[in-house]
UniProtKB/Swiss-Prot annotation:
May be involved in regulation of NF-kappa-B signaling. May be involved in copper-dependent atp7a trafficking between the trans-Golgi network and vesicles in the cell periphery. Its main location: other. It is found in: Endosome; Cytoplasm, Cytoskeleton, Microtubule organizing center, Centrosome. This is Coiled-coil domain-containing protein 22. One of its GO terms (biological process) is protein transport. Keywords: Coiled coil, Cytoplasm, Cytoskeleton, Endosome, Protein transport, Transport, Ubl conjugation pathway. Residues 243-269, 326-367, 400-540, 584-628 form a coiled coil. One of its GO terms (molecular function) is cullin family protein binding. InterPro entries: CCDC22 (IPR008530), CCDC22_CC (IPR048348), CCDC22_N (IPR048349). GO terms for cellular component: centrosome; endosome. Belongs to the CCDC22 family.
Length: 632
């Protein structure tokens, strides 16, 4: 316990407790020093609890009882679970005080300037730096702009404020991916400009990077949520699921473009936009016509959606630069009038488009009704044609009715016979097919059950992976927190001596364990030997008793020998019982000696003497108070 006491004393001194240099153990603490140490620790742990407590023990007994009760209540409020009261401080025992001080030392923050339980990590450190910077800026006095020096003008003006304006960036992906062409990798390595060179304004760099990172993170989160909710239920691999989804999006885009092109063509509004839509649809058809069966339509559509030819992009930019008018301050009014007229034309065109759209919807409804009527008429005509065909055949058979009836009867009989044969064949095939169907149904059900089980296992595995990832993140944060706490620990205390002493204690414990194991094994061997000897003695006495008892009826000396044998056996039993009782008494003596040592460490006698002295002091104080009351 000496090392533990030294660590506790060092912790108490770091809290502000004035522990004398000659005190090296908790056993040497008196009541005044205990009260001061506890109050100092409470003030560091929770200033609101220790602010109302005095670290100096008052001389009066009633005040001492009050401060002892207050300290006990404060320790219980902190979560101390063991028994604590005013007697713990006024009539202290070494184990109780050591346990209480260890509890308070564990509650102490690692650094008095910061809370030890603050989160660690890059984000937490960044937040702390931001808070410190804001506090520093808020602590600066405010001055009018004309009275500020150059540094304050830069730090307290709005010249550093910029709008959050993000722009698209072209960044290189992972070059280790095999799906990236070598030409693109070469472009990334040699010709791709840096991020700061891609943007016209330098303040947009941070906004663009933050926006790109946020979009990537949100895309990953949306994909995980979609894969959890829909992807796993589709029983497809992630690549197949993405391919199916992109094919559906391609079809929807193509359908929307076709509808827009058809609407522009019906409204007779030729323009550059309609021409672009037509070219786009033609490109879709060309891409999907020849290579659709080869499975490359998706790649071509993806290239169309996410990539552009550099030459085409350059031509479009040149054409846009030629078409866009160069604004001038003198032509602002003319441009405003032109914009107003164009807006009116756009409104009128939109109104015409809405009217044409309504008429188109009406025509579509009319076409649907007419198509339904035409289908009904076609169906009625087919039914009447069938009736006419049957009647015509019957009229042709009327001239030779008897022969035709005989032939018809023959055909009916043959058909009946053939039907019977077919029924027999069908029954035989039906039984076989029914068995096959039941077998296939059973196999399908087993496969579905197996698939469901695999699906459930996949979901459980995915959840376990997510839980493991969260646990890894939490442990990483905990590791960073512990690392920051370790770095913030005071470096003046050398841990080498404590570590060496801990290793010595561990080696001593191992030696004691070996000795205890050896004693236990020796005890077991001794007990086993005692049991063997006891059994041998009992068996020997039984055999001897039987042999002597047979001859004791006939011979007087043998009868005396039998009596001596019985007395010897009884005396041996009493001797063994006496030895066992002696061992029990010795064990009880050792237990009592240990209890005496424990009570001696609790300083029971000194505490009782102190209690008697306090009792006399209280009686004296009461007598003085009564005397003052009578005098008053």
């Amino acid at each position: 316990m000496e090392e533990v006491d030294r660590i506790l004393i060092h912790s108490l001194r770091s809290c502000g407790t004035e522990v004398p240099e000659d005190i090296q153990s908790i056993r040497q603490f008196n009541t005044e020093l205990i009260v001061e140490a506890v109050v100092r620790c409470l003030r560091v742990i929770n200033p609101s609890l220790g602010a109302t407590l005095s670290h100096v023990l008052p001389p009066g007994m009633s005040a001492q009882f009050r401060i002892g009760t207050s300290l006990a209540q404060a320790c219980q409020d902190l979560g101390y679970s063991s028994e604590v009261g005013y007697q713990t401080f006024l009539y202290s025992s070494e184990p109780d005080i050591r346990a209480l001080l260890i509890f308070l030392a564990e509650k102490l923050p690692r650094d008095s300037s910061e809370d030890a339980h603050q989160p660690a990590g890059k984000s937490a450190l960044l937040q702390r730096e931001i808070v410190a910077t804001i506090k520093q800026q808020l602590s600066l006095p405010w001055l009018p702009l004309s009275c500020r020096i150059a540094a304050l003008r830069r730090s307290q003006s709005s010249c550093r404020l910029h709008r959050f304006h993000s722009q698209p960036l072209s960044l290189a992906s992972d070059p280790a991916l095999k799906s990236i062409p070598n030409e693109r990798k070469e472009y990334w390595q040699r010709y791709l400009p840096s991020v700061t060179s891609q943007l016209p304004h330098l303040p947009s760099v941070a906004a663009s990077l933050l926006e790109r990172n946020t979009s990537k993170l949100s895309a990953v989160q949306e994909w995980e949520a979609e894969w959890k909710s829909q992807g796993l239920a589709s029983r497809l691999s992630p690549e197949d699921y993405r391919s199916k989804k992109q094919q559906r999006l391609q079809k929807r885009i193509q359908e929307q473009l076709r509808q827009c092109a058809q609407l522009l063509a019906e409204n007779h509004l030729p323009s550059s936009s309609s021409q672009d839509l037509t070219d786009m649809l033609r490109a879709f058809n060309l891409d999907g016509g020849s290579d659709q069966k080869k499975g490359s339509r998706f790649t071509r559509t993806q290239r169309f959606t996410y990539q552009q030819d550099p030459h085409t992009l350059k031509e479009q930019m040149q054409r846009a630069a030629e078409i866009l008018p160069k604004k001038d301050a003198q032509d602002a009014d003319a441009e405003q009038q032109e914009i107003s007229s164009l807006q009116e034309q756009i409104d009128s065109i939109e109104q015409e488009i809405r009217g044409l759209s309504e008429s188109n919807k009406l025509l579509q409804l009319t076409i649907g009704q007419v198509e339904g009527e035409v289908n009904d008429m076609h169906q009625s005509c087919e039914e009447k044609a069938n009736v006419v065909r049957v009647k015509k055949r019957a009229v042709e058979l009327l001239p030779d009715a008897d022969n035709n009836l005989d032939k018809l009867q023959t055909l009916v009989d043959a058909s009946a016979q053939r039907m019977a044969n077919l029924i027999g064949q069908w029954e035989s095939h039906q039984a076989r097919l029914s068995d096959e169907y039941m077998e296939l149904n059973r196999v399908q059900q087993e496969q579905e059950d197996e698939s469901s089980r695999w699906m459930k296992d996949a979901k459980d595995l995915y959840e376990k992976i997510q839980g493991s990832a969260d646990e890894a993140k939490r442990k990483e944060e905990l590791y960073k927190q512990l690392l920051s706490e370790y770095e913030s620990l005071p470096k003046e205390v050398s841990r080498a001596a404590y570590t060496q002493r801990i290793l010595e204690i561990v080696s001593n414990i191992k030696k004691q364990k070996e000795e205890i194991t050896k004693i236990l094994s020796d005890t077991k061997e001794l007990q086993k030997e005692i049991n063997n000897l006891t059994g041998k003695v009992d068996r020997t006495f039984v055999v001897t008793d039987e042999l002597v008892f047979k001859d004791a009826k006939k011979d007087e000396p043998v009868r005396k020998a039998y009596k001596y044998l019985a007395a010897l056996h009884e005396n041996c039993s009493q001797l063994i019982q006496t030895i066992e009782d002696t061992g029990t008494i010795l064990r009880e003596i050792r237990d009592l000696e240990e209890q005496i040592e424990t009570e001696t460490t609790k300083k029971t006698l000194s505490n009782l003497q102190k209690i008697l002295e306090d009792y006399r002091a209280i009686k004296q104080e009461n007598a003085q108070l009564l005397a003052r009351t009578r005098e008053a």
